[in-house]
């Protein structure tokens, strides 16, 4: 199975895989993975320590409706600078899900950027972000 993931360019990190239906948000799940890897980084090498922090910050920005197209491009650049440049494989595992998500679902990232309020309303119900966005009275 892992070989198939490499062959299709869809590795989601450390050998695991996640199956999402069309109702799930790729950006939200990628952000969750980035948070995990940032937390797990020991901080010994700069590409992983700094890179995982940047991945988390940029994905949070996009997920919460504050992102721009340039943030998607920066995400791509950051993950490229992590992969292959760390002491242990955790950095690679952190970069792979971001690369796979952008490679296969860039349109969903762009949708988040171009429709922030709609995205939050449809995907997250605004309950978690109620203090950050102006919501129409019901």
Predicted regions and their residues:
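Redox cofactor-anchoring modules in respiratory/redox and cofactor-processing assemblies
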Residues: 1-138
């Amino acid at each position: 199975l892992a070989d198939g993931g490499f062959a299709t360019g869809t590795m989601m990190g450390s050998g695991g895989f996640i199956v999402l239906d069309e109702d799930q948000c790729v950006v939200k799940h990628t952000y969750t993975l980035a948070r995990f890897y940032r937390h797990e980084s020991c901080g010994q090498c700069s590409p992983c320590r700094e890179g995982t922090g940047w991945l988390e910050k940029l994905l949070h920005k996009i997920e919460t409706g504050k992102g721009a197209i340039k943030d998607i491009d920066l995400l791509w650049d950051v993950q490229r600078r992590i992969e292959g440049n760390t002491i242990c494989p955790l950095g690679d595992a952190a970069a792979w899900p971001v690369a796979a998500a952008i490679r296969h679902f860039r349109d969903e990232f762009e949708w988040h950027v171009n429709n922030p309020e709609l995205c939050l309303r449809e995907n997250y119900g605004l309950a978690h972000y109620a203090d950050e966005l102006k919501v129409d009275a019901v």
